[in-house]
Every structure is written in C-alpha cells, then in structure tokens.
Amino acid sequence: MKFRSLALARIRGFTLIELLVVIAIAAILATVAVPALQGTVRDFRQRSALSLLVSDLNQARGEAIKRNSRVLLCVRNAAGNGCAASTNWLSGWVVCTTDAVTSTACDTASSPNPFIVRPALDTSLTLTVTDAASVALSTIRLNANSSQGAGSSAATLTLSGTWSGATAHTVTVASTGNVSKH
C-alpha cells in the first residue's frame, strides 16, 4: 500500500510558471508569424482573382465560338444581371451574349444570360482595363470568329494590390481574341 501512495505522489502536472512561459513563447511566435501570413493571404487573393479573370476570358471566347455569337465580358451592374456603364471593374463582372455588333448590353432574350456573374473584388485589389490607346474600357467583346469585332484593338487588364510591394499582373486579350497572362 505504501508503494502505491509514493507513485501517486510523484505524478504532477504543469506548474503555473511553466504554463506562463509556454504561453509567452507562443505569443512571440504568433507576433512574428502573423505579418508574414497576411502577406501570403493577400498574394493568394490576388492570384486567385487573376486566375478567375483569365478563366472567364477564356470561357467567354469559347462560348462565342460554341454559340457562334458575340459574347461580352463587362462591368457588372448593381443588380448583377447585366452590364454597367462604368469602368469600375472592382464591382465585379459578367459574361453574357449580345446580338448587336457594337452593343455593350446583354441580350436579355437568350437564356441563361448572363451566364457568369462575378461578385465585387477584394478592396485591397485594383483592376484596370484599357485598350491600345490607354482608354479605359467597360466592355470586352469577343466574336465567334475569334476576334473582338470591327475596330477593336487589344485590351490590357492590369490587376494589382494596393499594399506596398504588391506585384501588378497583366492579362492581354489580343484583337484575335487570344488571352495571355504576363
């Protein structure tokens, strides 16, 4: 019986001082790791938005060929069901078909239209879309013959972050409709 009580006497847990030392070390490590993690999360959001944009441009080009019609990628309106007369691409974008040659509006008669609706981008990102003359665009038009249409030139989409040290990524849509990421 005496042996059992000695064994129980030796079993102990952490002392309060040991616990406080472990908590202090964990706090120091967290303080060092959090800023690096925030940068990683921001870079991931930017790359994710870029991949989504390139994917939507390629899908718009493919849909134009598949449907043998004109397809628009344009700034999303507030309702999310068509194009806005704005160059603020941060509000999101839609991909839809249009029937008119120079139209910047979705064809509401076809269904489903728009067939891609993207929500607003993260506020830490900026997206600008310009033509060859650096004029801001609200619409990119892709035609069934793999071109952007009469009088269209290449469009350049630039996605960058608002934080210091952010890298700007550029996507070019050639007048032939080819999408390339730089």
Annotated model-derived regions:
Residues 3-27:
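Glycine-centered recognition micro-motifs in short, flexible terminal segments and loops
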Residues 2-6, 28, 32-58, 62, ...:
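N-terminal helix-rich module
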